Regions:
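Terminal targeting signals and extreme-terminal segments of soluble enzymes
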Residues: 1-182
Length: 182
C-alpha cells in the first residue's frame, strides 16, 4: 500500500527529549517554503503523537512567526493544562534553533451531548456536475487537490476592483485519502 503524500508530509520522529523531528515535503511546496496548511498539520500531529494526549482535536491556532524553510524542523508540543475532559497545548516549530511557528491547540474527550447545526449545506451542483479546475498550478501543493469551483475564487485579473468574498467549491485530495475527523 502506498503512503499518501500528506501522511508523508506530516510524519514525525519522536526524540529522547520528547520533541519531534520532521521534514517539509516537496508535494506541499508553496511560493516560498511549504504550504501553511501542512505546517499546521505537522504542529497538530506533534500533539496527536504525544504520549500525554487526552481526547481529539477541537481547535488549532497557528502563528507563522517567520518563513518556514524547506527542510528539517523540530517540534515541541507540551500540555499547558489538563482538565477532566479538555487539554490545552502549546507548540513550537524550530529550524536551526530559531522559532519559526508557534501554535496553541485544544483537545477534548468527546461526550454525549446536544448538538445543533446552525447552518445548512448550500444548494450547489453535485461534484460530478462541476468541471475540475485546470490550467497552470505554479505551486506544488495546489496539484495535490481536485478543486471544482462553483462561485468565487481567485480573480483572473488583479485590477484593484472589489469582488465578493463568497467562495464555494468542491475540494478533495487528488490521491484519495479519508478525512481524519469528519
Amino acid at each position: 500500500m502506498t503512503t499518501h503524500s500528506f501522511d508523508e508530509s506530516i510524519a514525525l520522529t519522536r526524540r529522547a527529549d520528547g520533541s519531534f523531528t520532521g521534514n517539509t515535503h516537496p508535494a506541499y511546496a508553496n511560493m516560498v517554503g511549504p504550504y501553511g496548511g501542512t505546517t499546521a498539520a505537522q504542529a497538530l500531529n506533534a500533539v496527536m503523537q504525544h504520549p500525554d494526549l487526552l481526547g481529539e482535536p477541537l481547535s488549532l491556532t497557528v502563528n507563522f512567526c517567520a518563513g518556514v524553510a524547506d527542510g528539517a524542523f523540530v517540534l515541541n508540543a507540551k500540555p499547558a493544562r489538563t482538565n477532566r475532559s479538555t487539554q490545552h497545548w502549546t507548540i513550537e516549530m524550530l529550524q536551526n534553533g530559531e522559532v519559526v511557528t508557534t501554535a496553541s491547540a485544544v483537545t477534548a474527550v468527546r461526550r454525549e451531548t446536544w448538538a445543533d447545526d446552525e447552518i445548512s449545506m448550500p444548494t450547489v451542483p453535485a461534484p460530478a456536475d462541476v468541471p475540475a479546475q485546470t490550467g497552470h498550478a505554479p505551486m506544488a501543493f495546489i496539484q495535490q487537490y481536485d478543486m471544482r469551483p462553483i462561485v468565487g475564487g481567485m480573480p483572473l485579473e488583479w485590477d484593484g476592483s472589489l469582488h465578493s468574498s463568497l467562495t464555494q467549491l468542491w475540494l478533495r485530495d487528488q490521491q484519495p485519502r479519508p478525512l481524519d475527523y469528519a
